[in-house]
């Protein structure tokens, strides 16, 4: 092990550490960071060399953050990234600095979004917040209005998590939905992601995602937002139901097939007669 450590350059050590951090399960960033910190044994190297991994983790995980002075949380996503460690809260029209290691928001300042698309963004946000409140009690959503390649685009991100470290499991739901505002009809593109880690007496992870594409009729802002939410609700319900049914099927068939029905002897043990068995006598003599 010492020989291997001597062969690794600082760059290689940081690259390995960064991979561990980026793949940390939901709610376990601090634990993975502390373990990597002990292994690397060089805080300056870790902070400087793996800073991109801290940022990538928060962007990938849709990390929610509370801005002081504002009631609702906002998600850290690539769509709100303003550069230089600053992010956008489109609902409250503020920018803020985000510390990717401490996961803290500071220095909120007024920041105007794209006014030309604000009425569309606001309508979708209102409908989306009502949907999230109904289906994800602990959920957070952030809705952006942006011009991408000359097209006015709405992007809605949802995050909901449950961290149960005392019960040895953590899980997170993420979904991202987008559509461009075009006459008559447009395409809604979505990606749904589930990640769960269970680690009591073992180490099991569920990592699943599904891509969605549906047609959306475009009319006025409010009606289009309602139709958009119908698509989101149907797709997310179907996906979650399918995940549950697959797990039930695996429990009834796959996992059951892995269990040995009988001992190697092909006979069941009569525990009332255990002393008459050779193993029973050996236990008695012991």
Swiss-Prot record:
Record has Phosphoprotein as a keyword: yes
Any Pfam family the entry gives: F-actin_cap_A
Sequence positions bearing N-acetylalanine: 2
Modified residues (Phosphoserine): 9
Family: Belongs to the F-actin-capping protein alpha subunit family.
Role: F-actin-capping proteins bind in a Ca(2+)-independent manner to the fast growing ends of actin filaments (barbed end) thereby blocking the exchange of subunits at these ends. Unlike other capping proteins (such as gelsolin and severin), these proteins do not sever actin filaments.
Name the record gives this protein: F-actin-capping protein subunit alpha-2
Organism in which the protein naturally occurs: Notamacropus eugenii (Tammar wallaby)
Name of encoding gene: CAPZA2
